[in-house]
């Protein structure tokens, strides 16, 4: 916004004494100037806020995954700069919007230790989003390498870079045993490949004790199709069924960066067609810190 200079004629003290009309005129003009200043100030504040957000760089681990890719896209759409941490840089260039100047693609493997991850995160990242996940197979240690030790490595890398905001994409039912859900088919299936949910829960516990400002997001069953309902958000160890679009999971992760109400919380999310639409301020605000 171009600033406009307005010349204001201020009555002299002598004239003020001679005329009460001048006094009233001056008061009215002064009030007008104050109103103008407030309007200008609010717009400037908005612009500065938007510019500041545009400069924030978010590191996304697992950026080429089905959920991670959506997180990257939504962060860019919101005006954030993104550093996409990927294992295969060449693949990422074809998968992600590599032509976007706000996107930087870097090699980052969470299984290779915190030192290399710290180098990838760098000094310019203000927050880290962990959207990693192992590929099901016969390596029963894979969930622990990625979902447990890999997440721990990321947290330690954040410490080394003084990054104090961490968003983790986890899963409902990670604490299924304590919830009495040992016989839940979803709990059994998700633990078939190396006790995946147990590995995720151990990583969650590490994050909580680390002192970092965290938001742990536990989505229900992940769908690739567009959203068909509104987000339902509940406290930890509440939901044991339900599904949600990956687009909505990505949205929750991005919004968690914007709302202080999301700090130091574990939230569980699904979507339901009959659920009322609520703001993220209300959704995060409805969950108590543990």
In which residue ranges do the predicted regions lie?
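N-terminal chloroplast transit peptides
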Residues: 1-39
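Short beta-strand "acidic-cap" motif of Rossmann-like dinucleotide-binding folds
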Residues: 82-84, 217
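NAD(P)H-binding glycine-rich loop region in Rossmannoid oxidoreductase-like domains
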Residues: 44, 52, 58, 64, ...
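Glycine-/Pro-rich loop/turn segments that contact NAD(P) or position catalytic residues
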Residues: 134-241
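Alpha-helix termination/capping residues and helix-transition junctions
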Residues: 122, 160, 209, 259-263
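Active-site-lining helix/loop region of Rossmann-like oxidoreductase modules
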Residues: 38-46, 50-53, 63, 198, ...
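Aromatic pocket-lining residues of Rossmann-like dinucleotide-binding sites
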Residues: 75
């Amino acid at each position: 916004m171009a600033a406009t200079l307005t010349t204001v004629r201020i009555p002299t003290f002598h004239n003020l004494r001679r005329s009460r009309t001048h006094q009233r005129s001056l008061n009215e003009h002064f009030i007008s100037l104050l109103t103008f200043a407030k309007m200008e100030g609010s717009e400037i504040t908005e612009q500065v806020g938007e510019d500041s957000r545009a400069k924030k760089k978010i590191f996304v681990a697992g950026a080429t995954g089905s959920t991670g890719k959506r997180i990257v896209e939504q962060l860019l759409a919101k005006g954030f700069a993104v550093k996409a941490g990927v294992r295969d840089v060449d693949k990422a260039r074809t998968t992600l919007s590599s032509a976007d100047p706000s996107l930087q693609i870097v090699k980052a493997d969470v299984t290779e230790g915190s030192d290399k991850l710290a180098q990838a995160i760098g000094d310019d990242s203000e927050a880290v989003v962990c959207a990693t996940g192992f590929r099901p197979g016969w390596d029963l240690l894979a969930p622990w390498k990625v979902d447990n030790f890999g997440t721990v490595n990321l947290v330690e890398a954040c410490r080394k870079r003084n990054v104090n905001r961490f968003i983790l994409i986890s899963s409902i039912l990670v604490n299924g045993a304590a919830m009495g859900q040992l016989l839940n088919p979803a709990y059994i299936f998700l633990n078939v490949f190396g006790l995946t949910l147990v590995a995720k829960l151990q990583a969650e516990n590490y994050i909580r004790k680390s002192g970092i400002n965290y938001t742990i997001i536990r989505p229900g069953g992940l769908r690739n199709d567009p959203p068909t309902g509104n987000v339902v958000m509940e406290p930890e160890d509440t939901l044991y069924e339900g599904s949600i679009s990956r687009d909505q999971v990505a949205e929750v992760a991005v919004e968690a960066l914007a709302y202080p109400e999301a700090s130091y919380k574990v939230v569980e999310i699904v979507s339901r067609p009959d659920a009322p639409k609520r703001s993220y301020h209300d959704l995060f605000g409805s969950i108590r810190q543990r």
